[in-house]
Amino acid sequence: MMITPTGDGPWLVAGLGNPGPTYAGNRHNAGFMVVDLLAERTGSRLKSHRSRADVAETRLAGARAVLARPLSFMNLSGGPVAAARSFYKVEVSRLIVVHDELDIPFGAVRLKRGGGDNGHNGLRSISSALGTRDYLRVRVGIGRPPGRMDPADFVLRDFTSTERRELPLLLEHAADSVEMLIADGLEPAQNRYHALL
């Protein structure tokens, strides 16, 4: 059963990544990067919160929103996301998780609601903590590893110098897609961003 947002409750936009400077430029931290960009756009400051996430209360597309970056490692993201959702009384239908996606080419953004975790430990942790997979995802394409490189190593490496030149546009598209999801809903946002690459 598909759940659609109702009323005027807040949105929770949770970007996934690993905390600390060691991981800051990693592909796996694309979700953090998008949330940081949204905070910058709205003049918001992420602050430590008892949910074990850095959070900022703000407005996106005219709606109340909470930006969050879990302070746990990726595979334990579910606890902080569930705690923030509970604290701010956010419906599952208003939860947007922003994460890196291996199976999408670098530079592309894809949106969906629900589905499997596709081997992504952060999504697996969130689905387990929430008891549902029926939340919105903004999937930031990082592409597949070259040759026989282990995907686990690939996601924990920094973007290449070539990718870094194109990264700002990718992050802009991902941040824009979050705002369009909130303003217009899933299908219009998919139609817009799935056509770009």
UniProtKB/Swiss-Prot annotation:
Keywords: Cytoplasm, Hydrolase, RNA-binding, tRNA-binding. Belongs to the PTH family. The active site is at residue 28. Monomer. Gene3D superfamilies: Peptidyl-tRNA hydrolase. It holds the Pfam family Pept_tRNA_hydro. The record marks 100 as: Stabilizes the basic form of H active site to accept a proton. TRNA binds at residues 23, 73, 75, 121. It comes from Frankia casuarinae (strain DSM 45818 / CECT 9043 / HFP020203 / CcI3). GO terms for biological process: protein quality control for misfolded or incompletely synthesized proteins; rescue of stalled ribosome. Its EC number is 3.1.1.29. InterPro entries: Pept_tRNA_hydro, Pept_tRNA_hydro_CS, Pept_tRNA_hydro_sf. It catalyses: an N-acyl-L-alpha-aminoacyl-tRNA + H2O = an N-acyl-L-amino acid + a tRNA + H(+). The record marks 18 as: Discriminates between blocked and unblocked aminoacyl-tRNA. One of its GO terms (cellular component) is cytoplasm. Hydrolyzes ribosome-free peptidyl-tRNAs (with 1 or more amino acids incorporated), which drop off the ribosome during protein synthesis, or as a result of ribosome stalling. Catalyzes the release of premature peptidyl moieties from peptidyl-tRNA molecules trapped in stalled 50S ribosomal subunits, and thus maintains levels of free tRNAs and 50S ribosomes. It is an enzyme of class 3 (hydrolase). PROSITE patterns: PEPT_TRNA_HYDROL_1, PEPT_TRNA_HYDROL_2. CDD domains: PTH. GO terms for molecular function: peptidyl-tRNA hydrolase activity; tRNA binding. This is Peptidyl-tRNA hydrolase. The lineage of its organism: Bacteria, Bacillati, Actinomycetota, Actinomycetes, Frankiales. It is found in: Cytoplasm.
